[in-house]
């Protein structure tokens, strides 16, 4: 993920990130988790600005002021991974920086809840409460999830809860 983030530049197509990810996967001798999963054609998801998640890499050209979420999964020794990184390109508006920071903080709030006996709803509550207390809303149609021998496993972790 770090190498993909560093590779991401203004003026490139999101398809170039996909190609770079394929090259890196070959270099590290891992297989893509996403390619072919439910018909997905890429090895990474490249969601730019208003695109929420799971966007297909293509001809979209990255511009000054864009934010891009790069979501990547690999299979290593029979186990899947799934992680994402957000890259801010060029001159980012203050309100966009604040938004990205708030989302990162919400992840940290959720992770801080994890301990034996805590329910996934408690984790989601911490995430959702932080987001909503900052004037944003949570996309309710998407959740976090476990990984293992399969790409999507239990537990499901919502971004809101009680």
Describe each PLM feature range:
Residues 1-162:
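Active-site neighborhoods and metal-handling regions in enzymes and metal-associated proteins
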């Amino acid at each position: 993920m770090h190498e993909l983030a560093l590779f991401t530049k203004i003026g490139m197509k999101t398809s170039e990130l996909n190609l770079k990810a394929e090259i890196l996967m070959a270099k590290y001798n891992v297989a893509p988790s996403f390619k072919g999963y439910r018909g997905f054609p890429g090895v990474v998801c490249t969601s730019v600005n208003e695109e929420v998640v799971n966007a297909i890499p293509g001809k979209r050209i990255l511009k000054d002021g864009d934010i891009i979420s790069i979501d990547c999964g690999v299979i290593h020794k029979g186990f899947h991974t799934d992680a994402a990184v957000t890259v801010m390109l060029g001159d980012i508006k203050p309100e966009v920086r604040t938004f990205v920071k708030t989302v990162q903080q919400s992840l940290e709030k959720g992770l801080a809840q994890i301990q034996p006996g805590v329910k996934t709803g408690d984790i989601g509550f911490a995430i959702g409460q932080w987001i909503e207390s900052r004037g944003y809303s949570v996309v309710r149609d998407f959740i976090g999830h476990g990984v293992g021998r399969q790409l999507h496993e239990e537990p499901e972790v919502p971004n809101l809860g009680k």
